[in-house]
Structures are given as C-alpha cells and as structure tokens.
C-alpha cells in the first residue's frame, strides 16, 4: 500500500489531525501534518491503541436509514409524493483466532482435496484414453484377420468353384462389397467417438488445472498482503459504510431505471428485475469484500496519492522572523532536514527556535527553493503616508551642537551666550545629559545642543551630531587635542556636518592657539587661512572674548548651508533626551525638524505613543506650539521613549497604538532571533569557560542618556574572570520592585541622581542590600572597579627567603639523611617549602621537615649560622648541594 500523509489518514478515519498526531506521539512516533505514514507505522499505532483501549469489538452493528421520495400517479392526472424510509441493520462479526485457524485449516484441506481430485481426474482421463486406444487396436487387428481369412476363402472358392455360374459370382461380390462398406462405416463412427472422448478428457483436465491455479493465486494474494489486514480495525467500518452507500445508490438507480423503462417499454419488466437483482448481488459482493473476504483483491482500497519521485521547488514566503518548524512546513519537508541543513551551514537550532530572515533565506535557497521576502511594515508605512505636510519651505534656525573634551568649557561657553549659570546645576560641573536651548541674537535665532565630554557618553554625542546642522568643536588653548576631541571629530565626519572650532580659554597665560591648529590639522580640520574649510574663533567663556565672532561664524556657516524647513503641516522631529518625572510621568525633550508641533497632537515616538498634554520650553514655560529647530519638553506619552527615536505626528491614536505595539513585537522577535547562536565553532569555547564571577547591578538614573552611558561604561569593565551584569535598568526613582529584583539576584542597587522611596527602603533594610547613590559618573565607575577587583583571584608569587649550603651529611634513624648546612643568605624557616639545587639545577622540591641547631629544635636560623636540615621524604642529599627556602605570598590584583 502506498504511503499516505497524516492529513489524508485523519480524513479517512474521520478524526482530527491534532488527535492523530498526539496518538502517534503516544506511540513513540513524531509526526507533523504533512509527514507520510508507512504501513509499519500504522501497525505500530494500531498495536498501541489496542494495548491502551483494548482490542476492537467482536461485533459491530451498523444502522442506516435512507430516505427517498416516490411519485405515485393519482386520479385526474395528478401525482402525489410519498416519503419512503428504508431502515437497514447490518452486523459484522469478527472471527476469533481459534475460528480463524480452523477456517484456515479447512481451506488448506479443501485446496489439497481439489488438487488431489485434479490429479485423479487427469490420471483417469489418461487411463481411459489408453484403454480405448488399445481396444480399437485389437478390434482393427481382428478385422484385418477376418478380412484376410475372407479373402483367402474367396480365392479358394474362386479357384475351386470356377465352374459356378456368373450370377453366383456377381451375388457374392455384391455381398462382400456391402459387408466392407458396413465395416468401414462402423470403423469411422468408432474413431469419431474416440476423438470426442479424448477432447472432453483434455478439456476437463485443463479446467481442473486452471481452477487449482486460480485458487492457489488467490490464497497467495490473501496471505501476502499484510496491509489489508494490518489496518482492518481502522478501516472496516468506513469500507462497510461505503459499500452500503454504493448498494443503496445501485438499488435507487435500479428503481429509477425500472420506473423509466416501465413507462417507456412495459414489455421489459423481466430485464429490469434481472438488472436490479444483478446490482444487488454486486453490492452484496462489495459488502462481503468490505468485511475482509479473503478472495477479494485490495486494489479498490489502495490510496490514490503517490509520493513525488523528485523534489518540488516551492516559493517560500519569509517574514522578518520565523521558527525552524514553520520554515520546514513552508518547504513541505521534515524539521530534521532543515536542522541538518543549518548544521551544514554552521548553525545549530532547535525546531522551535526563532531565526532571522537572512538565515532562513540561506537555508531555503540551500535546499533549492525560491525565497520571497515579505515586508511587514505596511501598516507603519500607511500611517506615515497619511500625514498633512506643507509644500512651501522657509528658512529655519541652525541647530548647533557644542562638542569637545571634558572640562574644556563647553557648558560655560553656552552659559555665557545664554547669560545664565547652568554649570552650577550640573554635579561636579560636568554635563550629565544633553541640554537643548535656543537663543535669540541680533542676527537671528540659534538652537544649541550641549553634549557631555566624558568618555562614557559616546552614544549621546553621536545622537547630538546626527541631529545637528553645525558642530562647534571647543578646544582648550592650554590643553590641546584630547581623546574626546578626536571622538567628536569622528562623529562630525560620520554625520557629514561642518565644524566651527572655538579655541577656548584664550585668556590663560599658557594658551597656545597655534598648537591647537597644528594638532587639529592632523585629523583633517584645517583653518581657512591654511586653505581649509573650518573657521577658527578664539574665545574666552570666562571673560566673554570673541563670543560675538563665534555667533557670526555660526550664522555665516548657516547661510552657506541654506537651511530650510516646512513650517506648516504635521510635525516630525527627534527625541534628544527622555526621563521619568515622578509628578508628570514620562517626559521627552524633542527637537522639531519640520512642521509645527501643537498641544493636543497625537504623536508616535518609537515604541511609545500618546497625545501631547503639555509642552514646555527649556526655561520651563508653557508653550502651545513649536516650529522647526525649536526644542521642547512634551508630556503625555505612554512610556519613556529611547533617546534618538523619531517623533511623528499622526492622525489616529488607534493607528498609532497599533504601530507602537507592532514595533515592540518586532523588536522583541528580532532581538530574540539575533541572540548569540550556539555555533559549532564556539561550542567548545562555551563549554571550557571556567568559574566566572559576576557583579550584578540594578541601575536607576534620572534620564535615559545617563542610563545608556553608565551601562556601556560598566559593561566595558568586564574581564574574562569578572563580568558586570546589568540585571535591570530604567529611568526614575528606586522602587520596591527594583529592591526585590536586587534581593533575588544578589545585585548592587545603584542610583544616579535618584533616590529610593519609602517602600523600597524597607525592603533594602530587611534584605540588607547594598544601596549606593552617585551624582558623578567618575565615582560610580571607580567604586564598581574596586568591587570587581575584590572578586579577582589573588596572584600567587614565590619569594626566596633563605639559602643554605650542604657541608656534610649525617644519618638519623628518625629522619633519614640530615644535611649539615651553613646559611649563606637570608633566613631558613621551619615547615616552609624548599628546593634542593645541584649545580644550580632543581632536583627536588618538597618541605623542610626538621631544623636543628646543635641538638635543639629551632624555628629559624639566620645568615652565617650552622644548622641541621631534614628534608621530608628525600634522602639523596649530597655535600655541595644548595637548599633554597621560599614562601608563597598572595598579591591582590586590581582592574586597570
């Protein structure tokens, strides 16, 4: 029997695919809906079901009802319909094993009897034919002897009776002729009868041989087809029901034919009866066959599906992420084949593991299928396209980012421009997050972004460079180019933003502006007087020198860039900074790029959405709208967005929520799919990782940028022996949930410019958690370094403390060989490890067991004194050897 799929088998036995798959799984066979099932697997399932639920019932009774309508002609040419219901009850009885064996023995005996009868019939026919031939030969011989005797007698009579008259001779000749003709006729009739008898015997023998061969063939087919009997209990009821349906259709068809033939040709009633009777006999034969008759061929129950002879290439549609099992179903192959293909490509995955689009595309193409990549952001594109944007572009204010090394005077320079003292508000005078301000000058408005200069704030500086039009690079004239200065240059070049250099602290006596120009020229920043494109302005944020020149240079550069933006229409911009305020909720600092942002607009911001409930400028004043290049703080988002996210005003809040949820799910799936895979090449590397200490940290900060900066800095401190693990991080105060998480994971609670609330402090006191507050990032990183250094295993170092020369060797019954020594260097101490040197080569390393001076045990012997040394488990001490005594000291390691 050909293989069938799980779906086809479930449809055949009228059960669900999931139930059949579960039954196969219970039987120890893992299958999916499109897998093929062999006859052996069917037999295994049947055996399992019989063992679990008991064998099939010995008797099966089917009750069938067939309803039909019969039109009977009535009076007046009218006909009325009569409802006919045919009820049938059929019982199928399963033979028990003893009866089956008895029937098999009877059939075997019947076949042997038929074979014996056939052989006896053939032998009897042969004997009869032989006897007839012998009788005919004997009769022929008698006739020939009689004819010869008659001829001799006739000749004698002719010779002796020559005198008989002519009439007598004529009468005798006539008599002989008639006798000869009668004998010839009798001989021909006997030969004809013998030929017919031989033909009849041959026909009987041939018929017996044919019947015996047919019986043998039917028996062999019945015994050699285990498929028909293997799934007998599974398919008997369906086959019987199908046979009854066929029987009903045949009977109904016969009735229809009989009625039509009766109306057209009344004389053929007998033919109708014979035809319907033949149909019923055929239906009964089908039912008997459905019950498992042994002389029925199983071709009618064979499956029509044939397994494809070659692989079928399909069009596989792949989304952003897909599991291995889904990919296998799309390609109509088993999951194990996909896993094997991935192992050949160097990646290991389970059948439920999520893989990204690129990996799925490689696997599908490797298996010979055509890949169609599906774009899943149609909803997002539809929402973004349904926006009102103005057509007329107007000049806008430049967005200027002030970048440079830490303590080079960036914030002080901006403070002088704004005529405020903001630097005092920053902890330690260091800018902890991006400040966005716009100032009005005599020549126009300028928007400033102040970025941190510390090494930990790389991502914040990168965001500032991407959202800006002009970069003002602040370099201290007395300090020159520093690491963060170089990094700021790289960010500006990556964003393709023009650079204006402000040489600050020009009023200091040790200021050297020419040195700054020379150092910057090494990184591609050339002044205009040297043929470059960058303007150099000498300023002093403390004295206010050159500030107007710097503003003029910025506006001049903006005129060259011809900065324009659409003022009317729905606004779009970028998140500069975000944080969680305890009284106001999520707050985002947004820089508007195009359009006008109004209070009450529906905004979509990365994974978050919401309606703008309030807008404030950098001074904390309420505003109703904000145009291009204006930074504002907005309230009303569903959560704290990530810094750098795009902010877009949309029409429908419901659509905005759908897009935000879709982005969250997509981000989660992509993040899961791109996690580190267990590849073959790094499997052993993962297995050989030894004992690694971990410093678990729960981090809370005031703004999102500080969280990112501190997380990056702490993760960079990880080494092969000690790893920093950020268990949880977020914006806002330390809550009870954070304290519970720290207690469960044995983590340190770190608060950066935030404090713990009352409920969190109770948990911290109850669990004795380590809680630390910081306001300067330097102190935080240094203390985490110290904590990590305490987890490093100490370094072991051997320090030589004494050296003794063997002058003589004595024998002791208790310690064996005793070396009489002179201490030449340092001090010899008892129970310390020693080395025995011979010709400056170490020949033994062990422990000093006994140390005596004269006959007294001593703990140490100083330089220039004689002593006796007993080496533990070593007796091969010779004169001239050197005994070196050392001790092992531990050196505490630290993280640089």
From Swiss-Prot:
Residues 93-307 are annotated as: Disordered. Residues 93-219, 272-285 have a biased composition (Basic and acidic residues). SUPFAM superfamilies: Initiation factor IF2/eIF5b, domain 3, P-loop containing nucleoside triphosphate hydrolases, Putative DNA-binding domain, Translation proteins. Residues 429-433 are annotated as: G2. GTP binds at residues 404-411, 450-454, 504-507. Residues 395-564 form the tr-type G domain. Keywords: Cytoplasm, GTP-binding, Initiation factor, Nucleotide-binding, Protein biosynthesis. Belongs to the TRAFAC class translation factor GTPase superfamily. Classic translation factor GTPase family. IF-2 subfamily. One of the essential components for the initiation of protein synthesis. Protects formylmethionyl-tRNA from spontaneous hydrolysis and promotes its binding to the 30S ribosomal subunits. Also involved in the hydrolysis of GTP during the formation of the 70S ribosomal complex. This is Translation initiation factor IF-2. The gene is infB.
């Amino acid at each position: 029997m050909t293989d069938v799929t799980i779906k086809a088998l479930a449809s055949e036995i009228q059960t669900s695919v999931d139930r059949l798959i579960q039954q196969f799984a219970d039987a120890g066979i893992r299958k999916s809906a499109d897998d093929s099932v062999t006859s052996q697997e069917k037999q295994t399932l049947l055996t399992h079901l019989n063992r679990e639920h008991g064998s099939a019932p010995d008797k099966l009774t089917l009750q069938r009802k067939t309803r039909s309508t019969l039109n009977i002609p009535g009076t007046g040419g009218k006909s009325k319909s009569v409802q006919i219901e045919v009820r049938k009850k059929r019982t199928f009885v399963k033979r028990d094993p003893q009866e089956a064996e008895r029937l098999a023995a009877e059939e075997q005996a019947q076949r042997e009897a038929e074979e014996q009868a056939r052989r006896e019939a053939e032998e009897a026919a042969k004997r009869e034919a032989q006897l007839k031939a012998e009788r005919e030969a004997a009769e022929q011989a008698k006739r020939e002897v009689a004819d010869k005797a008659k001829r001799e007698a006739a000749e004698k009579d002719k010779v002796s009776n020559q005198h008989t008259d002519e009439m007598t001779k004529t009468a005798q000749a006539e008599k002989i002729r008639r006798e000869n003709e009668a004998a010839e006729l009798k001989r021909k009739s006997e030969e004809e009868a013998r030929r017919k008898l031989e033909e009849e015997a041959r026909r009987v023998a041939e018929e017996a041989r044919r019947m015996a061969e047919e019986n043998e063939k039917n028996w062999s087919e019945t015994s050699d087809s285990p498929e028909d009997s293997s799934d007998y209990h599974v398919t008997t009821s369906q086959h019987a029901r199908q046979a009854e349906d066929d029987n009903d259709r045949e009977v109904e068809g016969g009735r229809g034919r009989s009625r039509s033939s009766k109306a057209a040709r009344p004389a053929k009633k007998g033919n109708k009866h014979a035809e319907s009777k033949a149909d019923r006999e055929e239906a009964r034969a089908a039912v008997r066959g459905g019950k498992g008759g042994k002389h029925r061929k199983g071709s009618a129950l064979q499956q029509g599906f044939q397994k494809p002879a070659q692989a079928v290439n399909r069009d596989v549609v792949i989304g952003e992420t897909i599991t291995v099992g889904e990919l296998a179903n799309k390609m109509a192959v088993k999951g194990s084949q996909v896993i094997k293909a991935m192992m050949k490509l160097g990646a290991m995955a389970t059948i439920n593991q999520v893989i990204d689009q690129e990996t799925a595309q490689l696997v599908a193409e490797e298996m010979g299928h055509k890949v169609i990549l599906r774009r899943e952001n149609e909803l997002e594109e539809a929402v973004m396209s349904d926006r009102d944007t103005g057509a007329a572009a107007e000049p806008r204010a430049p967005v200027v980012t002030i970048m440079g090394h830490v303590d080079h005077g960036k914030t002080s320079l901006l403070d002088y421009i704004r005529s405020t003292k903001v630097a005092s508000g920053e902890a330690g005078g260091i800018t902890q997050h991006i400040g966005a301000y716009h100032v009005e000058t005599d020549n126009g408005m300028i928007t400033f972004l102040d970025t941190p200069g510390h090494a930990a704030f790389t991502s914040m500086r990168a965001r500032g460079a991407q959202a800006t039009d002009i970069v003002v690079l602040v370099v201290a004239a007395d300090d020159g180019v520093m690491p963060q200065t170089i990094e700021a240059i790289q960010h500006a070049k990556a964003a393709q933003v023009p650079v204006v250099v402000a040489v600050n602290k020009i009023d200091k006596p040790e200021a050297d502006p020419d040195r700054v120009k020379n150092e910057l020229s090494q990184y591609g920043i050339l002044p205009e007087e040297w043929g470059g494109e960058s303007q150099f302005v000498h300023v002093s944020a403390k004295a206010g020198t050159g500030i107007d020149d710097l503003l003029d240079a910025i506006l001049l550069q903006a005129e060259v860039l011809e900065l324009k933006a659409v003022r009317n229409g729905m606004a779009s911009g970028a998140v500069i900074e975000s944080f969680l305020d305890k009284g106001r909720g999520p707050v985002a600092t947004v820089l508007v790029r195009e359009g006008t942002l109004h209070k009450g607009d529906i905004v979509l911001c990365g994974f978050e959405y919401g309606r703008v409930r309030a807008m404030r400028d950098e001074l904390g004043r309420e505003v109703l709208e904000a145009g291009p290049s204006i930074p504002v703080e907005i309230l009303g988002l569903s959560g704290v967005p990530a810094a750098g996210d795009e902010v877009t005003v949309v029409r429908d809040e419901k659509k905005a929520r759908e897009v935000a949820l879709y982005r969250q799910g997509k981000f989660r799936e992509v993040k899961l799919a791109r996690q580190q895979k267990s590849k073959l090449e790094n499997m052993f590397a993962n297995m050989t990782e030894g004992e690694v200490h971990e410093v678990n940290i729960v981090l809370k900060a005031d703004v999102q940028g500080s969280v990112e900066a501190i997380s990056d800095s702490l993760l960079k401190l990880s080494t092969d022996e000690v790893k920093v693990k950020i268990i949880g991080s977020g914006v806002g105060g330390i809550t009870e949930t954070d304290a519970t998480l720290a207690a469960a994971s044995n983590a340190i609670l770190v608060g950066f410019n935030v404090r713990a609330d009352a409920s969190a402090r109770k948990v911290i006191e109850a669990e004795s958690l380590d809680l630390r507050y910081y306001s300067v990032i330097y102190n935080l990183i240094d203390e985490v370094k110290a904590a990590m250094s305490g987890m490093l295993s100490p370094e072991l170092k051997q320090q030589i403390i004494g050296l003794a020369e063997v002058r003589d060797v004595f024998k002791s019954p208790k310690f064996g060989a005793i070396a009489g020594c002179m201490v030449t260097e340092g001090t010899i101490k008892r129970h310390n490890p020693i080395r025995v040197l011979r010709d400056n080569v170490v020949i033994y390393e062990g422990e000093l067991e006994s140390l005596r001076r004269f006959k007294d045990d001593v703990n140490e012997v100083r330089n220039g004194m004689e002593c006796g040394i007993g080496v533990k488990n070593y007796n091969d001490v010779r004169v001239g050897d050197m005994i070196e005594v050392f001790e092992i000291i531990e050196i505490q390691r630290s993280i640089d």
